[in-house]
Amino acid sequence: RNIRVNAIAPGMIESDMTAVLSDKVKDAMLAQIPMKEFGQAEQVADLTVFLAGQDYLTGQVVAIDGGLSM
């Protein structure tokens, strides 16, 4: 059938939505993320391209969250 289905589970991605958060809220969120930074849209886009190009990878949910879900 050659149907591939994968999903991306993003964590906090720097965006207009995170830009309006107070420093206190941002600091509290970043304290929980092992990489200590918000992700970037380009990083999610790179993962999307990778998943779309893999012929033998299917049925996966890939977290891109700076290690938060570990």
Predicted features and spans:
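C-terminal substrate-recognition "lid" of short-chain dehydrogenase/reductases
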Residues: 37-64, 69
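Short, flexible catalytic-loop segment of classical short-chain dehydrogenase/reductase
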Residues: 9-19
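N-terminal/domain-start segments enriched in small and hydrophobic, helix-friendly residues
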Residues: 5, 16, 26
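Catalytic Tyr-x(3-8)-Lys segment
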Residues: 24-43
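Short, cationic motifs built from Arg/Lys/His that form the positively charged side of catalytic pockets
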Residues: 4-6, 37
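Short, small/polar-rich loop/turn modules that mediate ligand/substrate recognition or access, typified
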Residues: 2-4, 58-59
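Hydrophobic/aromatic beta-strand patches that form the interior of the parallel beta-sheet core
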Residues: 6-8, 62
